[in-house]
A protein has these predicted regions:
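Short alpha-helical Gxxx[C/S/T] motif in the catalytic ATP-binding
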Residues: 112, 117, 121
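Conserved glycine-rich
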Residues: 129-130
């Protein structure tokens, strides 16, 4: 585990995804106010953020907006990726972390999702002994992960 600036990592992921975001007509807002240092495997954290952002772009609807934010509690940094659109059906919330599970198979075919991304996210976060999750909102869905910080 190394200490790194997650804002720098997320900025890079957003830049890498800019062509896809433009094609999908999605507006990405990243709310940051300077460096945020966390502990983890930078490569694996990048994989989690990339997965969350790609899923958000594929499922954004309505205002087609994605918001990335930080919150802090008990020595942890929570990174949240929210997208406007339809909430995930309540009965599917626990299952989305299972390999090959797809909530809407017809929609998944549209963008070519394999159903393994969130299972990889869960495995990575479990390997860090940290939490990840999903929260439905009236106007969209928020995926989050927590990492230790010394901020």
């Amino acid at each position: 585990m190394t200490r790194f600036d997650i804002t720098e990592l997320i900025t890079g992921v957003i830049q890498s995804a800019s062509i896809m975001a433009a094609q999908k007509k999605v507006d990405i807002q990243f709310y940051k106010d300077g460096p945020v240092y966390v502990w983890g495997d930078e490569f694996k954290v990048e994989e989690v953020i990339t997965n969350y952002l790609t899923n958000a772009m594929n499922h954004a609807d309505g205002q087609r907006r994605i918001e990335i934010r930080f919150s802090y509690h008990d020595g942890l940094v929570r990174t949240s990726v929210f997208n406007t659109g339809e909430p995930i059906p309540e009965e599917d919330l626990e299952k989305i972390w299972v390999k090959f599970y797809k909530v809407d198979k017809a929609r998944t075919r549209e963008y070519g999702g394999s159903g393994i991304g969130l299972s990889i996210v869960k495995a990575i976060m479990d390997s860090f002994h940290q939490k990840c999750g999903v929260i439905n909102h009236e106007n969209g869905v928020e995926f989050w992960m927590e990492l230790e910080s010394n901020n």
